[in-house]
A protein has these predicted regions:
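Short, strongly hydrophobic alpha-helical membrane anchors
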Residues: 1-5
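Functional transmembrane core segments of multi-pass inner-membrane proteins
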Residues: 12, 101, 105-162
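Alpha-helical membrane-inserting segments
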Residues: 23, 27, 90, 94-98, ...
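Transmembrane helix-loop junctions in multipass membrane proteins, especially transporters and channels
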Residues: 29-33, 37, 96-100, 150-153
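Membrane-interface loop-to-helix entry segments
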Residues: 20, 79-85, 129-133
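N-terminal signal-anchor transmembrane alpha helix
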Residues: 7-32
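Membrane-proximal soluble regions of multi-pass membrane proteins
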Residues: 23-80
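P-loop/Walker A nucleotide phosphate-binding surfaces of NTP-dependent enzymes
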Residues: 8, 36, 58, 81, ...
Length: 162
């Protein structure tokens, strides 16, 4: 049948595409001073029409709609699908590199990769990196570093107890 090492990268890629969709929300809203959770649903940047769930499936919806809003017909930037694909690929790569057994380390890298994706794409578009992303990375590093010593190559403090 299927083994976990074969299935895990595909699951990570699918999860990465979903996370990438949320990262697009952050990339669009943070530099504009908008909340990332209000409005809760995604909307067309041109006509502000709320996007129904079936038009918000990562990568597939953009391709199916040919990169256009189904309401007003205005183009939806190719950046949206690029972010979803890049996030998907990077999540799968992290899983391939670390394996499916070390989930805390994997999740920590996913978080750090996500912060870097937001910083990169906001910087490319607006030539800024929002403080929320910078301080989020600092906070994540400070919290995760002692919790997951493998992030910085240190052995686990519990390793000698085994």
């Amino acid at each position: 049948m299927f083994s976990i090492p074969l299935v895990a990268p595909f699951c990570a890629a699918a999860f990465g595409a979903l996370v990438g969709s949320f990262l697009n929300v952050c990339i669009h809203r943070l530099p504009r001073g908008m909340s990332v959770n209000k409005p809760r649903r995604s909307f067309c940047p041109a006509c502000e029409r709320l996007i129904p769930w079936y038009e918000n499936v990562p990568v597939l919806s953009w391709l199916f709609l040919r990169g256009r809003c189904s309401g007003c017909g205005n183009p939806i930037a190719v950046r949206y699908v690029i972010v979803e694909i890049v996030t998907s690929v990077l999540f799968a790569c992290v899983t391939l590199k670390l394996g499916a057994t070390n989930f805390p380390l994997q999740a920590a890298y996913w978080l750090l990769v996500s912060l870097m994706i937001v910083a990169t794409f906001v910087d490319l578009e607006h030539l800024i990196i929002p403080d929320e992303v910078t301080w989020g990375g600092v906070g994540a590093g400070l919290v995760l570093s002692p919790m997951i010593p493998a992030l910085h190559g240190a052995p686990s403090p519990l390793a000698g107890l085994a």
